[in-house]
UniProtKB/Swiss-Prot annotation:
It comes from Canis lupus familiaris (Dog). This is Isocitrate dehydrogenase [NAD] subunit alpha, mitochondrial. One of its GO terms (biological process) is tricarboxylic acid cycle. It comes from the Eukaryota. GO terms for cellular component: mitochondrion. It is found in: Mitochondrion. Catalytic subunit of the enzyme which catalyzes the decarboxylation of isocitrate (ICT) into alpha-ketoglutarate. The heterodimer composed of the alpha (IDH3A) and beta (IDH3B) subunits and the heterodimer composed of the alpha (IDH3A) and gamma (IDH3G) subunits, have considerable basal activity but the full activity of the heterotetramer (containing two subunits of IDH3A, one of IDH3B and one of IDH3G) requires the assembly and cooperative function of both heterodimers. The heterotetramer and the heterodimer composed of IDH3A and IDH3G subunits can be allosterically activated by citrate (CIT) or/and ADP, and the two activators can act independently or synergistically. The heterodimer composed of IDH3A and IDH3B subunits cannot be allosterically regulated and the allosteric regulation of the heterotetramer is through the IDH3G subunit and not the IDH3B subunit.
Amino acid sequence: AIEVQTVTLIPGD
């Protein structure tokens, strides 16, 4: 994740 990462349960984020 190239951003402010919140709790996102997505593989490959």
